[in-house]
Amino acid sequence: VWGQDPQIDKNGRFILNEAWAKLDFGKGFFAQLGRQTLVYDDERILGGLDWNVAGRYHDALKLGYANKNNEIHAILAFNQNDEKTAGGTYYNSSIGQPYKNMQTVWYHYKADKIPFGASLLFMNLGLETGNQLTQDSHTRYLQTMGTYLTYKNSGWNLDGAFYYQTGKNKDAESVSAFMASATAAYAFNKTWGMVVSFDYLSGNEEEI
């Protein structure tokens, strides 16, 4: 069933990791449908998780366009559990993907004259918050948006990211959080280099 398998399968069984078809419309436009990895920027939000035996995959439709300096992707995903003869549309994320549906737009700009790149991301996740016992389904939506910037020259490699999250989580609680990160790397020669980086997560507010 489309979207029934978990994002990371640890059961040691035989599974299909990737199976997709891509249609090239010409002039930079394409559509890609099926089970596929979604890898963007520094993989903080969407990544392949290649250190896991099975990797990370999504059953999704990806629509895209690319030219010399610009690239944009629109991603649509919908998940469901095994076939049901009764019981409604309740989705149990503990045995499948962590989200019920997803809509994502990603844009990347690559400059011509300087080694600079910038990405923008907006993701809307539909999370099941219904009642598993009664099979009543209710979907809450969580939005993540932000940017990822890079600059590289002969010695320096700089990148930074900022993401903000709002909406409702799977417990139907209001969310307002952010994450910021930055990395500066310098290569003294082919053997020696230095890297300085930091991450900041807003975390949860203390209950009073």
Give a label for each model feature:
Residues 1-27, 40-51, 131-133, 165-175:
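Surface-exposed loop and membrane-interface regions of Gram-negative outer-membrane beta-barrel proteins
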Residues 27-31, 49-207:
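Signature for the C-terminal beta-barrel architecture of outer-membrane proteins
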